Regions:
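Amphipathic alpha-helical polymerization modules
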Residues: 1-117
Length: 117
């Protein structure tokens, strides 16, 4: 596999994971006590990217709720919908760019094979 194809595929896989992590966070935005995750991209040799997922332990907002036992302080999730939406949009753009890199390299290799025939 050429380095350009490897790089593009690595990007597609990495940004797929970032999108999945943001989707997981958004799906749990209303889950009390949920701690959001962050997908951190790291360089991987040669010319690749790997993803490390970490949990953000920051406390979510606390609200006073009425339960059968009386008033209880409940910690909500620490997910910020605006931040997750922005992360999703950015990851999507990088995902598309990685796909384009694969497409471009595929076309280049096709042209090279045509010349060699």
């Amino acid at each position: 596999m050429t380095s350009a194809l490897y790089s593009g595929l690595s990007g597609v896989l990495a940004f797929s994971r970032k999108i999945a992590v943001s989707a997981h966070n958004l799906a749990n935005v209303n889950t009390d006590g949920f701690k959001k995750q962050r997908a951190v991209l790291e360089e991987a040799a040669p010319q690749g990217v790997r993803v490390r997922v970490e949990t953000i332990e920051a406390a979510g907002p606390r609200t006073l709720e009425l339960t059968e036992a009386g008033e209880t302080l409940v910690e909500k999730s620490n997910v910020d919908i605006a931040e997750e939406t922005a992360d999703l949009l950015l990851a999507r753009r990088f995902f598309e760019a990685s796909l384009k890199a694969i497409e471009t390299e595929n076309e280049r290799l096709g042209t090279l094979l045509d010349v060699l025939e």
